């Protein structure tokens, strides 16, 4: 079975809840259901601090990343008032996004993480969504990047997954798993995916 790798990028002031679902869903899939999926975390610095001051030691810094080693990019959103866009809009990260997209790799974003995708240009003339509260302020910002904004919880356009609030986090992680494990379509895989989704849905107490 071919090994698959997902890169989870953490910008300053990322949301812990949106980060943790990628680790949990892909970790359970690997540990209990035999999916050959592995995760590397990445940031601009060795330690990235979340919105509410939880420090995370990442596996790699952005300068160490070789896009060819990965099958997907996962991006948790974060709070602008805590400095999320200072790093999320950094040209080095925007370049990384463009490299993943140019190679047709899956890119999964949660909530406000769609904004750096928009700024990078990979969503121009494509369908996407982002944080929908605050009277749709951030969705209007996304439109400024030439994005066809859809006011739906999750929007998939080709290789890119976007969502509109933290409540969708687990759904996005499962969508990433479905699209990244990646086109293993045998019956065993479908069964294990269904069991895992049902189990984690109950644990997370979310509606999927």
Model-inferred region functions:
Residues 156:
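Active-site anion-handling motifs in enzyme catalytic cores
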């Amino acid at each position: 079975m071919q090994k698959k790798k997902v890169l989870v990028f953490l910008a300053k002031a990322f949301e812990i809840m949106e980060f943790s679902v990628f680790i949990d869903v892909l970790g359970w899939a690997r540990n209990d259901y035999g999916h050959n999926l592995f995760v590397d975390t990445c940031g601009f610095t060795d330690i990235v601090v979340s919105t509410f001051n939880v420090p995370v030691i990442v596996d790699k810094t952005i300068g160490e990343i070789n896009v060819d080693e990965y099958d997907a990019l996962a991006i948790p959103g974060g709070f602008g008032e805590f400095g999320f866009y200072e790093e999320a809009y950094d040209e080095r990260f925007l370049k990384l996004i463009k490299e993943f997209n140019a190679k047709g790799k899956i890119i999964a974003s949660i909530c406000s993480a769609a904004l750096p995708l928009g700024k990078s240009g990979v969503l121009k003339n494509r369908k996407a969504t982002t944080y929908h509260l605050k009277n749709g302020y951030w969705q209007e910002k996304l439109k400024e990047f030439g994005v066809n904004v859809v006011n739906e919880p999750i929007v998939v356009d080709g290789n890119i997954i976007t969502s509109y609030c933290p409540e969708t986090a687990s759904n996005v992680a499962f969508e990433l798993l479905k699209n990244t494990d990646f086109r293993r379509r045998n019956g065993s895989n479908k069964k294990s995916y269904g069991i895992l989704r049902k189990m984690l849905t109950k644990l997370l107490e979310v509606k999927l």
